[in-house]
From Swiss-Prot:
The gene is recO. It comes from Coxiella burnetii (strain RSA 493 / Nine Mile phase I). GO terms for biological process: DNA recombination; double-strand break repair. Keywords: DNA damage, DNA recombination, DNA repair. This is DNA repair protein RecO. Signal peptide: none annotated. Involved in DNA repair and RecF pathway recombination. It comes from the Bacteria. SUPFAM superfamilies: ArfGap/RecO-like zinc finger, Nucleic acid-binding proteins. NCBIfam families: reco.
Amino acid sequence: MTKRVALEPAFILHRRPYSNTSLILELLTPNHGRVCALARSARGLKSRYKGKLELFSPLLISWSGRSDLKFLGDVEANGMPYLLEGEALLCGFYLNELLIRLLHHDDPYLRLFHHYQNTLEKLVNGRLEATLRCFEKQLLDELGYGLPLSCDVEMKLPFKPDQFYQYLPDRGFLLCEKSEERDVFSGKSLLALQEESFSDESSLKEIKYLMRLTLNRLLGKKPLKTRELLF
């Protein structure tokens, strides 16, 4: 039986040409997660989708189909587009690439959908680096790979800002002396990440490295194209 979904909130993460006049879209939705859909004749001169299939625009989208590739139906605007420019636009592309690489099709991501929309708004108005770090943390949490930020792994004591902790993948953060050991982070930075408070530039730099370290384990050997262009 063909499954039909009517006017689901969505963002387009990616679009690519298909055949002579069509497009294949990667969508982010709250109740169906990542969805791949074929927009037939979307590039035709008289297409009903003309001007509607833009990235970073809140949409209401209908689709049908039983396979992994759905068939796009009606598309309506669901708010004003987020007008990203310059580095903010690159950040938006980075978010989209992360989601395409890490999300499975047809898994609901209600909170992540709202995190994504809030992040687009912050990219228009706010600090780019802090906004990206916050989204990366939220993404890891939603995927079940959130960092253990409540205490150190052995003593089970809360992080202290003036102490240092070595990150051990699959275990957590181990209290240590400040040294040349790899993957050592200040308690100050870990507390900032825990609270999603990124006002200190030195902590922000450490958090960026920690997020990259963690995400790389999920992404595998294939690098993100957008990461090469950012900062």
